[in-house]
């Protein structure tokens, strides 16, 4: 397919020769997002939800318009179900502490997959320690697939909460979330979905997925740092106590009684990141203008190009599926005899940015039998030249490490 060069929309990529292949960690920001955040500070800079003057009203309007944009983007039923946070980590911790600590008890079981990012594992382990609930793992296969048998082995009449990733940040594979949700409903469990790696790449429809909570970070879909989203089913959010307390999340306070604000502000204590929310709105609009069909088509072609090229290089071991279409732009690999950190350093010397390490998924690394991997993650602003430069550099790693070839 003929690809548009989207790098022109991104100041860092336009003005810097870097080959950026670490979008699963954070995406680059288009000029429109950078400008929108600056415009907020130039024209609307006041404390939202507080100032009873024109500038304060404008700031509040921007903030709430951003919430409505997010609601439409993920097809939530009400803006009351959209909570702004700092990132997916905070969103998941909010659910763990506000829901898990209050509604789970000794003997209950929490299911997570072995592929989870630590942000969707550790909060549940803390909940288990505090409540007496138990964390159980849904096993997967080396290619990241989860079978019906593996699901049924994990679920039981004690399952009360299931926390799963939508797309693995290591293997790029999709979990069978609709089937997981069906099984969860059969035993009365709620489902918490980490959509950090899916929201930037594929359409995410809350009502179709029918999950109870969903979390993602803005920065992975080109929004500013410091803005994240938690979707929560309204009937559950209504029952949950606040996660943080302080300014602007109360209706009234006396010496003897506190009445908390209505949704969604009950969960947004303190001064909010209105500029970040406005930048998130712009990032969503930018994605919508391009379209997920275009984004997916570019990513699929470039992933196949990278995958096929790596398969031709000796001593390369790709983690996950043998089908590049099942990687969602994420390719984790190892090179025989070379530590991933050394691979990353060599590629960095060639102007190529990739991630090396355990990717905050150490139980998955243990399952795969590797301490760490090198990860290349592709987004629609990458080009064929980027992939070719990456492959050329990877092919030289063993020689440059003194192996000859």
Task: Identify the function of each model-found stretch.
Residues 1-405:
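Pyridoxal 5′-phosphate
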């Amino acid at each position: 397919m003929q690809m548009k060069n989207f790098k022109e929309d991104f100041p860092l990529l336009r003005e810097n020769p870097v080959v950026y292949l670490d979008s699963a960690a954070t995406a680059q920001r288009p000029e429109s997002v950078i400008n929108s955040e600056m415009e907020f500070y130039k024209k609307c800079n006041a404390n939202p939800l507080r100032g009873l003057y024109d500038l304060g009203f404008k700031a509040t309007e921007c903030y709430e318009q951003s919430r409505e944009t997010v609601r439409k983007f993920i097809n939530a039923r009400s803006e009351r179900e959209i909570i702004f946070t700092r990132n997916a980590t905070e969103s998941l911790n909010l659910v763990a502490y506000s829901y898990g600590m209050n509604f789970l008890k000794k003997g209950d079981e929490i299911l997570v997959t072995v592929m989870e990012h630590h942000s969707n594992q550790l909060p549940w382990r803390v909940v288990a320690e505090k409540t007496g609930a138990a964390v159980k793992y849904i096993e997967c296969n080396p290619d990241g697939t989860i079978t019906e048998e593996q699901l049924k082995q994990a679920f039981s009449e004690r399952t009360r909460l299931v926390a799963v990733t939508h797309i693995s940040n290591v293997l790029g594979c999709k979990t069978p979330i609709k089937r997981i949700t069906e099984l969860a409903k059969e035993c009365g469990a709620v489902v918490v979905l980490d959509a950090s790696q899916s929201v930037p790449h594929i359409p995410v429809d809350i009502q179709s997925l029918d999950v109870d909570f969903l979390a993602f970070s803005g920065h992975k879909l080109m929004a500013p740092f410091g803005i994240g989203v938690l979707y929560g089913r309204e009937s559950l959010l209504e029952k949950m106590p606040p996660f943080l307390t302080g300014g602007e999340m109360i209706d009234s306070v006396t010496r003897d009684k506190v009445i908390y604000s209505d949704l969604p502000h009950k969960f947004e204590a303190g001064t909010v990141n209105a500029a970040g929310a406005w930048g998130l709105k712009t990032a969503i609009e930018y994605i919508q203008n391009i379209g997920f069909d275009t984004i997916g088509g570019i990513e699929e072609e470039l992933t196949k190009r990278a995958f096929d090229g790596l398969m031709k290089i000796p001593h390369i071991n790709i983690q996950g599926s043998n089908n590049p279409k099942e990687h969602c732009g994420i390719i984790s690999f190892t090179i025989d005899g070379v530590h991933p950190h050394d691979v990353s350093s060599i590629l960095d010397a060639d102007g190529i940015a990739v991630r090396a390490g355990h990717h905050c998924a150490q139980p998955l690394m243990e399952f795969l039998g590797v301490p760490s991997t090198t990860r290349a993650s592709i987004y629609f602003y990458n080009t064929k030249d980027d992939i070719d430069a990456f492959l050329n550099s990877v092919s030289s790693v063993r020689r440059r490490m003194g192996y000859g070839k």
